[in-house]
Amino acid sequence: MNAIADVQSSRDLRNLPINQVGIKDLRFPITLKTAEGTQSTVARLTMTVYLPAEQKGTHMSRFVALMEQHTEVLDFAQLHRLTAEMVALLDSRAGKISVSFPFFRKKTAPVSGIRSLLDYDVSLTGEMKDGAYGHSMKVMIPVTSLCPCSKEISQYGAHNQRSHVTVSLTSDAEVGIEEVIDYVETQASCQLYGLLKRPDEKYVTEKAYENPKFVEDMVRDVATSLIADKRIKSFVVESENFESIHNHSAYAYIAYP
């Protein structure tokens, strides 16, 4: 029986290294460690490694094989282990794993007390280079914003809208997804809820009216909360307000430090 050729392991003569090569958008079921225990969800993974100039190709099947071997609950410690194992398995000096997924949180309506789920977009990234490891987290939190100028100049009412506040951070110690959500929702004109009754709708409408925020206010207030958390080394806060009186969004961005 003839041996099957291993083309990707052959030598490449163009002398060009590749910064990242691997697989993108692998859908895979995962179990997350959360503040309340665990949560099952479906993630999209991007897994890449550095490829030296002399090597023609990476071993694509090994990325999927690695995930098939691991069913442990995912947290930052497990992401570190996965990233290190991937780099070793692909015989590389650097690699990155990004795991993106919907995260669900049970929320209680402010008046009726009725419970419902709200979803948030989350990405966890682990990166290793020459033995040094770092991780980051990105969370998109939908909230309500109400315009202070509209409130000030109008005899009644004020324009309000849904906003997406996105926090990307690096930290020395693990920061929970729920903690990031709380930092943002506390600073919004009002939180969002999956299910509201009429008394709840009255409450959130009035709460937003009494707590107006420009897009500038939103990013500054969230940034102030994040700076106070000494576990957090660096962050980016973005807010996009989907303006109800315009066909464009208002946008603000703060990077720290």
Curated annotation (Swiss-Prot):
Catalytically driven reaction(s): GTP + H2O = 7,8-dihydroneopterin 3'-triphosphate + formate + H(+)
Annotated EC: 3.5.4.16
Pathway: Cofactor biosynthesis; 7,8-dihydroneopterin triphosphate biosynthesis; 7,8-dihydroneopterin triphosphate from GTP: step 1/1
Pfam families per the UniProt record, alphabetical: GCHY-1
Keywords, in A-Z order: Hydrolase
Signal peptide coordinates: none
Keyword flag Ribosomal protein: no
One GO-annotated biological process of the protein: tetrahydrofolate biosynthetic process
Molecular function via GO: GTP cyclohydrolase I activity
May be catalytically important, annotated site positions: C147
Protein family membership: Belongs to the GTP cyclohydrolase IV family.
Functional description taken from the UniProt entry: Converts GTP to 7,8-dihydroneopterin triphosphate.
Name under which the protein is recorded: GTP cyclohydrolase FolE2
Species classification: Bacteria, Pseudomonadati, Pseudomonadota, Betaproteobacteria, Neisseriales
